[in-house]
């Protein structure tokens, strides 16, 4: 008798074995981090999204088989393709988000993954993607989920301005703060050029069938308060981040 495995399950198992970060990037991870922007889900590593789709911080979910109810998790998102500095030739990184305090919830994503939630906003509040329309490449945005060290103590003042986030070295950060390898990862692309279009996207549903939505009211990060601002003229050099100020309440 022949047994057929549902294609969705096959795709999920294949995803577990494939690298979930861009080629050449470290740290690596082979487990997929589910990344959900409102009802738009990053189904495939490297998928292209419309800039507007990623305007707010995504929800996260991890394979239920990997969930440890006692574990606290940390989320990091990086842009790997910030245009070079004046006179430079190498693209740089930008820390778009570092959010601590994630814990497993009781909600399931399509019965296979557990939604995570945090009441914290920092130490580096979310900056949405915004690659310049004048750039020549689509930017790669990497999402990483780490087990959060109990002793981790990062002040919000460390990322008070966008300039403090440029050139962020995730490997050095991990070494200096005792952060172990990521448990899961994912990445997507956003192309700032007007002619760019998003590739296939999917919707995410919780076990009850309702579209996954954020739960709880985010509270202030407990680190030092700081203001994030982009000096006029700096925007074009970065990933197209609009002029804004985010106050860590």
Predicted regions and their residues:
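Classical eukaryotic N-terminal signal peptides for Sec-dependent ER targeting/secretion
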Residues: 1-10, 230-232, 236
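N-terminus-centered regions that define maturation/targeting leaders and the start
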Residues: 15-223, 227-249
